[in-house]
Amino acid sequence: MMSSMESPEVRVLVFGLVTTAIGGAFAWLWITSLRVVYARAWPRGLRTAAWAFVALWALTSLGRVAARALSAPDVLYGPLTVTSTGTLLVVLLTTPLLVGARLLLRWLEARDRARLVERAAADVEPASREPSPEARVEAPASPARASTEVTHEASGFTRRALALGVVRSAPLAGVSAATFGLGEGMTDAVLNEVEMQFPGLPPALEGLRILQYSDVHLGQFIDLREIERLARLGEAAKPDLVVLTGDVADDLDLLPDALGLFAGIRPRLGTFASIGNHEYFRGLHKARRAYERGPVPLLMESGTVIPVGDARLHLAGADDPRFLGLQSRGFFESTVDKALDGGPSDAFHVLLSHRPEGFDAARTRGLELTLAGHTHGAQVGFAERSVLEPLMPDRYLWGPYQQGGSRLYTSSGTGHWMPFRIGCPREIVVLTLRRGPIDAPAVKRRLRLRA
């Protein structure tokens, strides 16, 4: 029997309350930082507007949690989600800037105090060296020194004014970034082709095209009409095989219809799926039932062998750990072993792992190709890579990767549960297999096809 904490509704409620509490901490830090940064320029109107903004976020966030827990219609849940997400993004984007501004202002104040102390010490001379009144003669001020002091004062004032101007523009910058990110997040998904070369690719698999959808998150921001458009766009790429690498739906009531639309692409080698963490989060039993009754097989710690001419393609699917922790490495090694169990050693192996961390276990076992998602590329990218790539080089956040003779592609996601993206568009990926040297870089290009 399912315990109360295993209920999807309870998990959604707990998750919503936890994220609201974290957001509340950021909101408090945001308000206090605004007060410090604006100091005397903190009029009642600005103070009222800031608190009203935080109140709007709090009310819509709690309302969204309640609406989800009570299964409220989308006509109510949608506006609450958009408003709470937009306001939270402004807070999250501006808080680091404002905290940095607080530190900068403290440094400026400490520097000014130190300079005042130095000047006071320089103006006080020892009494023993003080000349008699008769001998004291006022020397004219040096024009050069006077000019230098004025220049220093003006320079300090200019730097301070510039610094204050920059930090006080943080809220406007945050609103602009949030607006731009929300706008880009609501744009259509793009279709990218990625060519990868493998030295041992069987001739029968030369030019094989695998169409990958990942992290569609059907529900609040992605509806069935969008799924239909995505399926048509993918069909225009003429794939041989279609794979869904987890997090297909947040609203599991819509999952059967979505699977029917993806299966309607009718690739010659079929359509297959792997599990994601949101299937667990929303209700694994319900998700598995949809797959069992639908046209798309779910590969969950299992695999299938697909004959392609005189070659064989072994397609395997890993499980998802739900949460990453100290035991995650062992989990991925175990789930990949189970997925590969019984697979022919002479086949070309493709692993579907919702999380790209499964690639480390796959490459140590000699798998040629792993397809993953989950990260959404952090939803902010530059030059086809996540902006967090330098900080997390071993997390495989977005794009093609290679380790030894194994390759990985991590999708930026076909959908999202939060419609915010900058330089990291939603994508459908067509992976084309080529025979060639393993050290040849993957080639990625945009396909201009119409759905």
Predicted regions and their residues:
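Soluble catalytic domains of enzymes that build or remodel membrane lipids, polysaccharides, and related
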Residues: V190-E193, Q197-R450
